From Swiss-Prot:
Belongs to the UPF0346 family. SUPFAM superfamilies: YozE-like. This is UPF0346 protein LBA0976. Pfam families: YozE_SAM_like. HAMAP family: UPF0346. InterPro entries: UPF0346, YozE_SAM-like, YozE_SAM-like_sf.
């Protein structure tokens, strides 16, 4: 099986402190979340964590968009 980076590692490539993009803001905030599951790849596990712990995420649709971008990147 090919190596697949974690969602967190991918998300960190989307950080941009000067951006108003919701995914960039999600990444900026996730960087400071000390309990974020940094090795996780699974959508359901990440979704469960974020629903319960990520008050910095304005909407789960932001996560959905970021995860779709992650999946597309991991296909190559």
């Amino acid at each position: 099986m090919a190596y697949r980076e974690s969602f967190y590692r991918y998300l960190m490539t989307q950080r941009d402190a000067d951006s108003s993009d919701e995914v960039a803001q999600f990444a900026n905030n996730a960087q400071h979340d000390l309990t974020f599951p940094k090795q996780e790849q699974d959508y359901e596990e990440l979704s469960d964590y974020l629903e319960l712990n990520a008050s910095y995420l304005p909407s789960m649709s932001v996560f959905d968009r970021a995860y779709k971008m992650y999946e597309e990147k991991m296909m190559y």
